[in-house]
Amino acid sequence: MNWKRNLWIAWLGNFFIGASLSLVVPFMSLYVEELGARGSMVEFYSGLAVSSTALTAALLSPVWGSLADKYGRKPMMIRAAFAMTFTMGGLAFVPNVFWLIVLRLLNGVFSGYVPNSTALIASQAPKKHSGYALGTLSTGVVAGTLMGPLLGGMIAQSLGMRNVFLLVGFFLFVVTLWTIFGIKEDFHPVSKEKEVSTKQLFQRIPQKSILFGLFITSMVIQMIGQSISPILTLYIRSLGQKENLLLVSGAIVSAMGVSSIFSSSWLGKLGDKMGNHRLLLLALLYSFVIYIFCARAGTPLELGIYRFLFGLGTGALLPGVSSLLNKITPKEGISRIFSY
């Protein structure tokens, strides 16, 4: 099994998944306004539209992870991409905020492409190269997630917001086909005699305190990274940006992705050499300091520069967590652990 070939194919799939999910970020609050929300309810529904996907994904992800351990990671990747083709593309046709929230909830229910691709590569890459492999893979979703808004802002500015959702649906269908014909997995399901429950799986992990700490760290990292996204356009507007608001918002969000591309692979190799836990601690400290500067930005340009610098640190965060998880997790339960 050529794990490097799968790595780059999964990288491209993750890039399109990340881009598809983030293309809507620059104008989500404006789309909510278009659907009829007014005043303070715009921020509320914008935040709900984004967080509802994360909520249902968090609840259902362990279920998909368990199925991946039984039937393979590739089928779960195909399922996620194909289902999201309709849940994301259908956002172009919603008549009001209620149906927007419903489809966003369903999008989270059927998600799971990224954690299953991560589990796939983690199960195939040699342990000594896990930092490099997972660091490289993470640049795909990070780059897509943070460069997607620039493309989304440009398309929304010129063609209208609803057409962006149709484009997203097309991207996700391409990812479905790409995964079917590109990803190779020699999966051997665990026999029922050797099958372990989730409780037994956790009992087999000796470093339970480390596992719990990594779960908390992962949750905090993703919460910090996504918390500002629903209202970033409104924040940039409050800093004085009036013209080309969607384009500027997309560029500022994407600045973080550009720097993450440069840093993730290199930092992944550095983590393999110096220890992923040391690199993770340094990256957390660095990101904390830069995030404070983001809050004190006085102009859109300053915010863009700070977001770029912040991205340099994020290149070591989730890859570092994934690499450490891979090292302490039994092979037979890697999809379930990564789904959490």
Q: Where is each model-derived feature located?
A:
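Pair of pore-lining "gating" transmembrane helices in MFS-fold secondary transporters
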Residues: 3-30, 34, 208-227, 308
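Symmetry-related core transmembrane helices of the 12-TM Major Facilitator Superfamily/SLC fold
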Residues: 164-181
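Conserved MFS/SLC helix-loop-helix module at the cytosolic interface between two early adjacent transmembrane helices
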Residues: 59-95, 271-277
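Cytoplasmic helix-loop-helix junction between adjacent transmembrane helices
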Residues: 103-141, 324
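Juxtamembrane intracellular "pre-TM" segments in multi-pass secondary transporters
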Residues: 1-3, 184-214
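Central cavity-lining transmembrane alpha-helices of secondary-active solute carriers
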Residues: 48-64, 254-266
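Short amphipathic helix-loop junctions that connect adjacent transmembrane helices
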Residues: 27-43, 231-247
